[in-house]
């Protein structure tokens, strides 16, 4: 009697994982995914390598990833190194002309090219751009209003060169993705006045996802996702559920603007937005290609 081949358990699990991924690969082939990359995943070489490999794999199976990156901490370090003092109003950095130039240098000249290099080492072909290139993202100046502490009247606060996306011209991104390239986008845009404006990276990613009619928006963070009152991960959320949880103070702090970006994107036509833990190796692949997923998925009611 011939011996029966018993496959190694680990090999069998890998084969089952690939089999489980097949319907998702078929579903998303040819679709655009916008991935906001930042936090721990950006500062750790091992995490950066894992991220780059995930992005290259997505491209290899027919998905078109577009990477948007942040860089606030790195900008802060450079400003400090150059002896430039930062001014903050209600927790928001005031971006004067000098600060804007330094921010662009760090975002487009350093961080952006580092990510391009990581993707290149993983076998991909990446191109570093910003929202200024080909007027990819046009912005309007952010206007902030607060109550005057003296008389309680509204007053306008000038944050300098900080912008909010108002339009996306997708032609450059389409040209790059159709040529087999992976766009890596720095969160910088151009105003109607021709000036350069910094953009919040989450906001930039959300605007691009909407403008590119992306199937998915991923926001990589340093938390597991959105947690309930018992600190357990919420797998899916709708705008109405988010509103209820926010009113109950279950959702608070920095998670609120991230979820606002998710809601705006799905209301603008993005199929779903996902808040993911960038500290978890291959979290994007786990979220996409397994039934359980890895983060919090936001979809319409």
Swiss-Prot record:
Location in or out of the cell: Cytoplasm
Claim: Transferase is one of the keywords in the record: yes
Catalyzed reactions: N-acetyl-L-glutamate + ATP = N-acetyl-L-glutamyl 5-phosphate + ADP
An annotated GO BP: L-arginine biosynthetic process
GO MF term set: acetylglutamate kinase activity; ATP binding
Main location: cytoplasm
GO cellular component: cytoplasm
CDD domains: AAK_NAGK-C
Highest taxon in the source lineage: Bacteria
Enzyme Commission number(s) from the entry: 2.7.2.8
NCBIfam families the record matches: argB (TIGR00761)
Family indicated by similarity: Belongs to the acetylglutamate kinase family. ArgB subfamily.
Function in brief: Catalyzes the ATP-dependent phosphorylation of N-acetyl-L-glutamate.
Annotated protein name in UniProt: Acetylglutamate kinase
């Amino acid at each position: 009697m011939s011996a029966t081949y018993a496959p190694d358990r680990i090999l069998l699990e890998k084969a089952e994982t690939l089999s489980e991924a097949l319907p998702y690969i078929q579903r998303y082939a040819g679709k655009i995914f916008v991935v906001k990359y930042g936090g721990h995943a950006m500062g750790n070489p091992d995490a950066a390598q894992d991220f780059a490999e995930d992005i290259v794999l997505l491209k290899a199976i027919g998905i078109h990833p577009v990477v948007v990156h942040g860089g606030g901490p790195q900008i802060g370090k450079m400003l400090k190194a150059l002896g430039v003092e930062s001014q903050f109003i209600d927790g928001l950095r005031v971006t004067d002309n000098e600060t804007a130039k330094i921010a662009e240098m760090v975002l487009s000249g350093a961080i952006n090219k580092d990510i391009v290099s990581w993707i290149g080492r993983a076998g991909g072909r990446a191109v570093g751009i910003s929202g200024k290139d080909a007027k990819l993202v046009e912005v309007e100046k952010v206007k902030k209003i607060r109550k005057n502490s003296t008389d309680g009247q509204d007053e306008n606060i000038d944050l300098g060169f900080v912008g909010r996306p108002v339009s996306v011209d997708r032609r450059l991104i389409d040209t790059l993705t159709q040529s087999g390239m992976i766009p890596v986008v720095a969160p910088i845009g151009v105003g109607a006045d021709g000036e350069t404006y910094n953009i919040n990276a989450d906001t930039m990613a959300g605007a691009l996802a909407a403008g590119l009619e992306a199937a998915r928006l991923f926001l990589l963070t340093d938390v597991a996702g959105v947690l309930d009152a018992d600190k357990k991960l919420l797998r899916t959320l709708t705008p109405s559920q988010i509103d209820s949880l926010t009113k109950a103070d279950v959702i608070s702090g920095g998670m609120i603007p991230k979820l606002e970006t998710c809601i705006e994107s799905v209301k603008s036509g993005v199929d779903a937005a996902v808040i993911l833990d960038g500290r978890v190796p291959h979290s994007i692949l786990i979220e996409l290609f397994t039934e359980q997923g890895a983060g919090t998925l936001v979809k319409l009611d």
